[in-house]
Amino acid sequence: MELDSLNTKPLRILISNDDGVHAQGIHALADELRSIAEVIIVAPDRNRSGASNSLTLEQPLRVSEIAPNTYSVQGTPTDCVHFALNELMKDDLPDLVLSGINHGANLGDDVLYSGTVAAAMEGHFLGVQAIAFSLVGKRHFESAAKIARQLVEQHLAAPIPTNRLLNVNVPDLPLESLGEIEVTRLGARHHAENMIKQKDPRGHDIYWLGPPGKEQDAGEGTDFYAIEHGRVSITPLQVDLTAHESLRAMDSWLKEEK
């Protein structure tokens, strides 16, 4: 379906990320979608990986249009989507908010730290269907972009049947080598490894975060398992973090006689 063939209002897509406005992944995604949609990029001016849902509260956001429909923001991924939906596009909201393509996986507990997922989550917060895309590597961005287009076109033909944020991870493989798309749940990792202690040139202690923990819950049905077997993982996420199954137990605990 080409944009010029549409007789109705053209599809509008907002794209953001956490790797920065100049990252390869975001432009692979935008280039793939421009033939079926009007694409507006609003992304951080630099890499903001791991920013999660943070907002900039104590300084202004500086925004520059660095190319037609491409905006660089001195802020976090959440800032970018918040600005786009509440200011830049407030009079003509996009039909979709897409985030990515991230340079690396966002599997299991990663979603709690991910700026990629957070950008999509902000779109969801503000009432727009949102999808986060991540490539489990840094080579085959065209594969992830093709998967993104496939899902967008499927959404146009039959809207996504859930009011949830979607988290999509794509194996770093050529398109023809990818397995099917599998609906998954989040897996889980072991705790991250220890901090790495070093000395700076002046002899002061400095610390680096250790590598992420190995997969702890990576069995069949998880996002880790799908990726390990060459399949695209798509996980519906909800913002409500309430442990609903624990409400009754907590209520009983509070009412126990001391």
Curated annotation (Swiss-Prot):
Cofactor: a divalent metal cation
InterPro entries xrefs: SurE (IPR030048), SurE-like_Pase/nucleotidase (IPR002828), SurE-like_sf (IPR036523)
GO molecular-function terms, A-Z: 3'-nucleotidase activity; 5'-nucleotidase activity; exopolyphosphatase activity; metal ion binding; nucleotide binding
Residues that bind a divalent metal cation: 18-19, 49, 102
Stored HAMAP family: SurE (MF_00060)
Function: Nucleotidase that shows phosphatase activity on nucleoside 5'-monophosphates.
Name of this protein: 5'-nucleotidase SurE
